[in-house]
């Protein structure tokens, strides 16, 4: 598989970008040149080349994540286990940000 040359959009495919890996992708992107001529157009136009690049980049990130899955912390639950006052909190958003008590403005003496 040929290495994609970003100044030649016709060489950009999802599989060629994915095969670079993340390190190779960053190096190839940093070393890329401007498109000086239109002698190598992508079959689906510039947007097609961009789409192929993004798909290949996403696939390379997925491969990187899978390759290092054993070297990362296990995902942790966002909320603590069953809290005694869970019934007081709304069932959406970040539960820890809501007080389990009803919050009211302090009343000033002499006002209704």
UniProtKB/Swiss-Prot annotation:
Major subcellular location class: virion
Signal peptide extent: none
Alphabetical list of Pfam families matching this protein: Herpes_UL35
Acetylation in keyword set: no
Superkingdom classification of source: Viruses
Subcellular location field: Virion; Host nucleus
Keyword Transmembrane helix assigned: no
Keywords, alphabetical: Capsid protein, Host nucleus, Host-virus interaction, Virion
Biological processes annotated in GO: viral process
Coiled-coil stretches: none
GO cellular component entries: host cell nucleus; viral capsid
InterPro entries: Herpes_UL35
Function: Participates in the assembly of the infectious particles by decorating the outer surface of the capsid shell and thus forming a layer between the capsid and the tegument. Complexes composed of the major capsid protein and small capsomere-interacting protein/SCP assemble together in the host cytoplasm and are translocated to the nucleus, where they accumulate and participate in capsid assembly. Interaction with host dynein light chains suggests a possible function in the retrogarde transport of incoming viral capsids.
Family: Belongs to the herpesviridae small capsomere-interacting protein family.
Subunit comment: Interacts with the major capsid protein/MCP. Interacts with host TSPAN7; this interaction may be responsible for the presence of TSPAN7 in extracellular virions. Interacts with host MAPRE3 and DYNLT1; these interactions mediate retrograde transport of viral capsids.
Identification of the protein by name: Small capsomere-interacting protein
Organism listed in the record: Human herpesvirus 1 (strain 17) (HHV-1)
Lineage: Viruses, Duplodnaviria, Heunggongvirae, Peploviricota, Herviviricetes
